[in-house]
Design a protein with these regions (language model features):
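N-terminal Rossmann-like NAD(P)+-binding subdomain of aldehyde/semialdehyde dehydrogenases
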Residues: 2-107, 135, 275
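Conserved C-terminal structural/oligomerization subdomain of aldehyde/semialdehyde dehydrogenase
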Residues: 3, 33, 317-456
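Rossmann-like NAD(P) dinucleotide-binding subdomain of oxidoreductase/dehydrogenase enzymes
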Residues: 97-236
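ATP/NTP phosphate-donor binding region
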Residues: 457-546, 819-820
Length: 885
């Protein structure tokens, strides 16, 4: 027996026939999806050409079958659907790679959606049946049409014209299909089985499309309100409205449904309407037409697309056969007023408004009750920008047309050439739609974005000038007079340095150059916002063109904050202190600095590196809030590193600041944002600290040791100013804040624990940064070890020796091993542990750490640092284990 082949019924009038048709179309679409752009464009052009040539017979068919509209206008619609749509998209890429940027590693690839279900309205049957298949062909989709029962013949005929031309040009057979005997059940089936729905029709049909469970591109009802402002060109306005409202007897959904005219020009507007052949209904006639517009609360289908005279006759009114529009002068914009509804015919409501605001209020109500999201129009002198902006702000419509006939203007590319041509006009969320623009080819493709991994642009930012060497301060300051010609200098320092004559060399040099100066020396060890504000107030009175901040990190930080407040008195520290993941992508834009004053930083200790960093910390003593500011606008313009200013630093300061330098360099080297530039600075700083910190600690008068430690501090500062720090500093910041330990000591107490933590080859989470490809911190630490002469069989062995060498360094400078040894009360430490941990996790430094921390892991580091490695009490371990579960 011969095998029975599946056949597709020639007439689609049953669910079974439709199922077979859809299956065949999906197979055709799979073939079509492989076509090149050149093949598609050939098909697109052939189909558009055929539709254009058939525009007149198709227009005749539409009027004959539906009994609506005007043949000549439908010819224009068909012509528009073919020619304008082709012209708009002939050069648009819709196949394969449509966009590529090799520099940024982005490629966009267009793919067809599949099978489109197209619901076609009775008002624009042939033009819509040209438009939708054309954009489907351009996007390599199959399209199956569900025609309106009252327009099925002409709709199918239009689709056939497009299909036959497409197939002849190489398209797969059956790429366009239709239901021959349309019904609600078959339409629902089409919508369920298609991949996307293009729904144009009444509110019920559009709602069904959105309720089908498939993506839908539908439109909402139009109730276009027009306002004629008293500045408008009356002849232009009236004749544009007539031109639009009479086009195809008002069946374009964007056509005007009401016109609101300002009282001052109402009479002239009315006269122009009359002169151009419109008819104003008398009071008794108004009531008759009202009863004709709506039947049982719904639009009377019999008036749709009919001539004005025909509608008048239906209402029992006699008007000239040449009457263009029936105009009803009404007052209410409420839905109880029949004239306030969409009428899809040459029937127009006309309102009078005393003011422009009243006109807008009427238009708003008309849109809200019947045309949310669709179209509105305004006739006005375009120099009236304020009125135009007010109108645009008030109208919840996706098309706001200025001095434009709304039927022809709304569909696009006729009166504005950036509004894309379409016969499916999206109304946005206001109209219950998924799109708020004219639907086109971009809505019928899926775009795949291929994103190649790219690494961030990195940078090296330093002060414009860095001067260093013992005794260089007065020489560097020469530039203020000889090069920059500064006139007034403001010095910022603390009281100890001022009273002990540290600023005298600066003051003497300024006097020698004839530069007027003053000194603010009330900076506290933990600089406060109050003292910074006081300093800034003094600056504003003195009006310096140069600021010199001299001291440790506190004085330099305070100087930076005063600089900000001096140049930007309204600076918001809450915003400036916002955390960031990438300093170049932060939400807050720092104010540009340097407009009023040049900033010079002069360190008196070897530790913070603040003279070359874009960081500052300020505390609001009234609230206890610390604001850590970070932005390259805070980078000093000049740094002067003169060892003469550091020779008398006591042992405690030398120890704490020296180990801070080591921590800066270690964290900068391990940071995810480390680069070849910062690596060199960090490694050299580490070598110098190992070699010279013990000497500087043992003998403060050792000039060579002091000089090298000053250089190490500055280089480590440059390194972490660009590579940033990590959780070592996050933990130390909070340890110091909660338990009042010197910052450098706090860093030292967690240092070895953090290094072990970061060196894990299998971390719970690695940090996120494109340059950081995989956990390799152990190898980085081993590189540091080898750079200072350590050897071993593997990275782990070298790392262990590095830890040992660091411990020996800290022992040499007499840093204790645990937090507990510094007298921090155990009970209070444990009470603050959770809060400390959370704040450390949220610290700005955490983001660049190579291992992204869990809070439980940070807590464990704190406990190890308090009790010592391996000395955490068993009771505490059990408690932590229980809380972690």
């Amino acid at each position: 027996m011969a095998k029975k082949e599946n056949t597709i019924p020639t007439i689609i009038d049953t669910p079974e026939a439709l199922t077979a048709k859809i299956a065949a179309m999906k197979e055709a679409q799979k073939i079509f999806a492989t076509f090149t752009q050149e093949q598609v464009d050939k098909i697109f052009k052939a189909a558009a050409t055929a539709a254009d040539k058939a525009r007149i017979p198709l227009a005749k068919d539409a009027v004959e079958e539906t009994g609506m509209g005007i043949v000549e206008d439908k010819v224009i619609k068909n012509h528009y659907a073919a020619e304008y749509v082709y012209n708009a998209y002939k050069n648009t890429r819709t196949c394969g790679v449509i966009e590529e940027d090799t520099a940024y590693g982005i490629k966009k690839i267009a793919e067809p959606i599949g099978l489109i279900a197209a619901v076609i309205p009775t008002t624009n049957p042939t033009s819509t049946a040209i438009f939708k298949p054309l954009i489907a062909l351009k996007t390599r989709n199959a399209i199956i049409i569900s025609p309106h029962p009252r327009a099925k013949k002409c709709t199918i005929e239009a689709a056939k014209v497009v299909l036959e031309a497409a197939v002849e040009a190489g398209a797969p057979k059956g790429i366009i299909g239709w239901i021959d005997v349309p019904s609600l059940d078959l339409t629902n089936q089409v919508m369920r089985e298609a991949d996307i729905i293009l729904a144009t029709g009444g509110p019920g049909m559009v709602k069904a499309a959105y309720s089908s469970g498939k993506p839908a591109l539908g439109v909402g009802p139009g109730n276009t309100p027009v306002i004629i402002d008293d500045s408008a060109d009356i002849r232009l306005a009236v004749n544009s409205i007539i031109h639009s409202k009479t086009f195809d007897n008002g069946m374009i959904c964007a056509s005007e449904q009401s016109v609101t005219v300002l009282e001052s020009i109402y009479k002239k507007v009315k006269e122009e309407f009359l002169y151009r052949g419109c008819y104003f209904l008398k009071p008794d006639e108004l009531e008759k037409v009202r009863k004709t517009i709506l039947i049982n609360g719904a639009l009377n289908a019999k008036i749709v697309g009919q001539k004005a005279a025909t509608i008048a006759e239906m209402a029992g009114i006699t008007v000239s056969p040449e009457t263009k529009i029936l105009i009803g002068e009404v007052e209410s914009v409420d839905i109880s007023e029949e004239f306030a509804h969409e009428k899809l015919s040459p029937v127009l409501a006309m309102y009078k408004a005393k003011t422009f605001d009243e006109a807008i209020a009427k238009a708003e109500q008309l849109v809200a009750d019947g045309g949310y999201g669709h179209t509105s129009a305004l006739y006005i002198d375009t120099r009236e920008k304020e009125k135009m902006e007010k109108h645009a702000a008030a109208m919840k419509t996706c098309r706001i047309l200025i001095n434009t006939p709304s039927s022809q203007g709304g569909i696009g590319d006729l009166y504005n050439f950036k509004l894309v041509p379409s016969l499916t006009l999206g109304c946005g969320s206001w109209g219950g739609n998924s799109v708020s623009e004219n639907v086109g080819v971009k809505h019928l493709i899926n775009i795949k974005t291929v994103a190649e991994r790219r690494e961030n642009m990195l940078w090296i930012r330093t002060p414009e000038k860095v001067y260093f060497k013992k005794g260089c301060l007065p020489v560097a300051l020469d530039e203020l007079g000889t090069v920059m010609h500064k006139k007034r200098c403001f010095i910022v320092t603390d009281s100890f340095l001022y009273k002990n004559g540290y600023t005298k060399k600066i003051e003497d040099k300024l006097d020698q150059m004839g530069i007027v100066h003053t000194c603010f020396y009330d900076v506290e060890p933990d600089p406060s916002l109050a003292s910074a504000r006081a300093g800034a107030a003094a600056m504003r009175m003195f009006e310096p063109d140069c600021i010199i901040a001299m001291g440790g990190g506190s004085a330099m930080d305070a100087g930076k904050i005063m600089w900000v407040l001096y140049e930007n008195p309204d600076a918001n520290f809450d915003d400036m202190a916002m955390d960031f993941m990438d300093i170049r992508k932060r939400i807050f834009t720092f104010p540009h600095m340097g407009k009023k004053a040049y900033f010079i930083a002069v360190p008196t200790s070897s530790g913070t590196g603040s003279e070359v960093t874009p960081f500052a910390i300020i505390t609001d003593k009234t609230t206890g809030i610390k604001w850590p500011l970070a932005d390259y606008e805070l980078m000093p313009d000049m740094a002067i590193v003169d060892t003469d200013n550091m020779m008398s630093a006591p042992k405690g300061l030398t120890c704490a600041s020296g180990i801070d330098v080591m921590t800066h360099a270690l964290e900068a080297y391990a940071s995810m944002m480390a680069s070849d530039y910062t690596d060199g600075l960090a490694l050299n700083a580490i070598k110098l600290v190992f070699n010279y910190l013990p000497r500087a600690y043992k003998d403060g008068s050792d000039v060579e040791a002091r000089q090298h430690m000053a250089n190490a501090s500055c280089m480590a500062g440059m390194a972490f100013a660009n590579a940033f720090l990590g959780v070592n500093h996050s933990l130390a910041h909070k340890l110091g804040a909660f338990h009042h330990l010197p910052h450098g000591i706090a860093n030292a107490l967690v240092l070895l624990h953090v290094l072990r933590y970061n060196a894990a080859e299998v971390p719970a989470k690695m940090g996120t940064f494109p340059q950081y490809q995989y956990p390799h911190t152990l190898a980085r630490y081993a590189e540091i070890g080898r750079s200072v002469g350590l050897t071993g069989k593997n990275d782990s062995e070298v790392f262990e020796k590095l830890l040992q060498k660091l411990q020996e360094l800290m022992d040499t400078i007499e840093i204790k091993h645990t937090i507990k040894e510094y007298g921090v009360d155990e009970k209070y430490f444990l009470e603050t542990l959770d809060e400390m941990t959370e704040q450390a996790f949220n610290d700005q430094c955490t983001g660049a750490n190579p291992r992204y921390p869990l809070m439980s892991e940070l807590k464990e580091i704190y406990l190890k640092a308090y009790y010592g490695e391996g000395n955490i009490p068993e009771s505490r371990k059990a408690k932590e284990k229980k809380e972690t579960k």
